[in-house]
Amino acid sequence: MAHVIDFKEAGFDSVLDELEWRGLISQSTDRDRLAEALNGEPITYYCGFDPTAASLHIGNLVQLINMRHLQAAGHHPIALVGGATGLIGDPRQSGERTLNPKDVVAGWADRLKKQIGGILETEGSNPVRFVSNYDWTASMNVIDFLRDVGKNFRMGTMLAKDTVARRLNSEEGISFTEFSYQVLQGNDFLHLFDEYHCVLEIGGSDQWGNLTSGLDLIHKVRGVDVNVFTSPIITDAQGKKFGKSEGNAVWLDGTMLSPYKFYQFWFNRPDSEMENLLKAFTFLPKAEIERLIEESKTNPGAREAQRTLAWEVTSFVHGEEATRQAIEAAGALFGRGGDLADIDESTLEAAIDGMKVDGEFAKVAAGDRVAEAGMKAGLFKSISEARKTIKSGGVYLNNTRVEDEEQTLQEGDFLHGRFVLIRRGKKALGVVEQA
């Protein structure tokens, strides 16, 4: 895992100063009140994660990084996995959510808990505490909910929330189920305040209305002013949210998006994004980030910033060993170090996934000529072109130069008994699979 340092090691006077410099705070309650809370004795804070999919994604990663910064500063984290709210789903910008079966949501909740536990400290003097709002919500009957919780919410305030107002004015409208979500989330904050004296909730900027519901509820029924802050929503180059409901999710679960593809996602970010991404997604000291940003401007071809970003984020999420394998796989594919035989099957399969022809790998067998296999892989238009390129020394079989135009595939050429990599020159790579 990437090395996590506290705000002093990173070059800041306080954790709040660090979070603001990194661009990790979008909106907050009164800044002085928030600073007083974070700069004093350790407080308890929480962030909620609804199990609406089998994995968290990089939009959630921003919140986990915020939690880790606060944890490193000595504050006590609570990770709420929404066993109750996950059955409902918070209102989206457009369209009603599909309600998932209870057993599916419970299974997803277990997976999310495991993911979060792999990122936050779960042992030592300041471990993360896991809670599920199902534990205090499921037993509450409708009458008690309306009398004890619902009476503290005003319709005017609820209707004014951005997402609610937008949905009300849309063609789809909004159901009472999704409209009630903010009441459940507000009650969560109150419960955690009463149970653990939790005085800070964090979330994405699209959650501001839900966060302030709990803020207002605690002020009304307990007479205490607590704090909330949100982080900016991460978007792609087209300004679209990197979220699971948008169809371009970058999952944190290695079985849903391999560590290799996760690494490549970060490595392929453009120079224009380096400053924001290095600040938000790494724990590197301020001075080192500033050096990398300057380096990306003066020597962009070196891609040191991208390489550092990809290493830091991938090792933070997937661990150092999986990250090393991803790096070695990328180098080995094009003969730039590393041995193809050392790449495990799942990493290799992820690395070559984008090299399919018409959605699949061309099928070959031992005894087929390399020239024919190269043509099937889409590297050549004809057998004669393949032979000519072999003759000039420009064809490689699993990174070994092919010397004979009539060379055939051998059983030992198939990596993991399945794949053969054929390269034309330095950059054109094709893959065939054993039939």
From Swiss-Prot:
A motif ('KMSKS' region) lies at residues 241-245. Keywords: Aminoacyl-tRNA synthetase, ATP-binding, Cytoplasm, Ligase, Nucleotide-binding, Protein biosynthesis, RNA-binding. Gene3D superfamilies: HUPs, RNA-binding S4 domain, Tyrosyl-Transfer RNA Synthetase. ATP binds at K244. L-tyrosine binds at Y46, Y181, Q185. NCBIfam families: tyrS (TIGR00234). Catalyzes the attachment of tyrosine to tRNA(Tyr) in a two-step reaction: tyrosine is first activated by ATP to form Tyr-AMP and then transferred to the acceptor end of tRNA(Tyr). This is Tyrosine--tRNA ligase. The lineage of its organism: Bacteria, Bacillati, Actinomycetota, Actinomycetes, Bifidobacteriales.
